[in-house]
Amino acid sequence: LCALLLLAAAQIREVPSTTALWAAPAILLAAMLIAWAAESAQFFVAQGFALAILAWLQTLPEFAVEFVLAWKQQVPLLLANLTGALRLLTGLGWPMIYAVAALASRARRRKPLKEIRLEEAHCVEVVGLLVPLIYITFVWAKASLNLIDAGVLILIYVAYLIVLRRMPPEQPEGIEDLELIPRSIVKAPRRTRNLVIVALFAAGGALIYLCAEPFLGSLLAISAALGVPSFVFVQWVAPFVSEFPEKVSAFYWARTIDRAPMALMNMVSSNINQWTLLAAMLPIVYSISRGAPSTIPFDQQQELEILMTLGQSLVGMLFLVNMKLAWWEASSLFSLWFIQFVFSPVKPGPGLLGFLAAHIHWYVTVAYLTWFALGLLRYVLGRRRMDAFHLFGEMWRRHIRPRPAPAVK
C-alpha cells in the first residue's frame, strides 16, 4: 500500500521519448517475473487468488495515474481514464487473448480454436464480476460517487478475495504442463519454492514501481510529438500503457492454448479490481485533496461514458456465464470497442463524420444494452446454459460453506 501511495503521489515528469527504449523492456521483464510467480503459486493457493494478487500488482501504474488525477480534482479526466481502462480490458484484452490462442492453435495443432473453455473454478470470477456491476448500476443511476460507495465497493472486493481464498489449489497433475521456469519453482524444496515465489512477486512489483512513471512519461512525449489530444491520451494511451504488464503475462499464457482460460481470468480479475478498488479509491483521494468528505458528480457526458462501459462489461459477463468465450463473442466485443475507439479523436461537427462522432457513444451504448437484454432473455427462456451460477453454487457447498458431515451414531 505504501509503495502504491508513493508511486501514485509522484508527478509524471517530462522525459525524452527515447526513455521507452529501456523502460519498455523493464516493464516486459516485470510482467514475466510476476507471471512466473502467479503460475507457480496456483499449485499452493487457489489460482483465482493468485491471479487477484497478480492483477493488483500489474495495475499499479493505473492506480497511480488515477490517484494523480483525483488528487488534482480533474473529474472529467479521471472518469475518462477509468472508463477507458475498463473498456480496453474487455473490448481489446479479452478478444486479443482469444486471437493469440487461436493463432497458436492454428500453428501448433493445425486446427481452428472455436472457443476458450473455462475451468470449473473460474465460475467464481464470472459471478464475482456481476456483483460490482450491479452496484455500479446504482452509482450510475444517482450520477455520483461518494465515500459510502467507496466503502461498499471495498467490501465487495474483500468478500471476493475471501471466497477465492477458500477455493482449492490446482491439482499436481498439471505441473508437468508448465514451462521450464515455473515448473522448476514448483518442484523445488518448500522453503526455496516459497522464497522464490515471493521474490518474483516482489521483484516484478518493484520493477513496475520504478519504471511505470518513466515509461508513461516517454509515451506522453511520443503522443505530444504526434499531436495526440490530452483527452485521448488520458482515455486510451495512458490506460493501454498502465495495463501493459497485464497484457504481456496474459498473452504469454494465451499462446500455450491450454492456459488461455487462465489468461482470460487474469483480465476478468483486473475488471473486478478496477470496478471495485480503483473506483473506490477515487472519492477517497478526491475527499482528502479537498480537505473534506466530497462527492464526485457526473455530468451528462460522464454518465454516458459510465453507462457504455457498464453495458460492455455486462455483455462480456453474459458471454462467460456459459463458461466459454466463443470466437464470435470475442469478435463482437472487439468490433463494438473498435467502432467507438476510431471516432474518439474525431471532433463533433458538420458532415457525416462530425455527426457520427457526436452520437457514436450513444449508438454503441444502445447496442450493448440491447445485446445484454436479449442475452438475458435467452438465459431466462432456457436457450443458453447458466453454468457459472450452477457451478458457483456447487463450489459454495463444497469449499466455501461446506456442510458438516453427519455425526456417526
Predicted region positions:
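Hydrophobic alpha-helical segments, chiefly the membrane-spanning helices
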Residues: 1-409
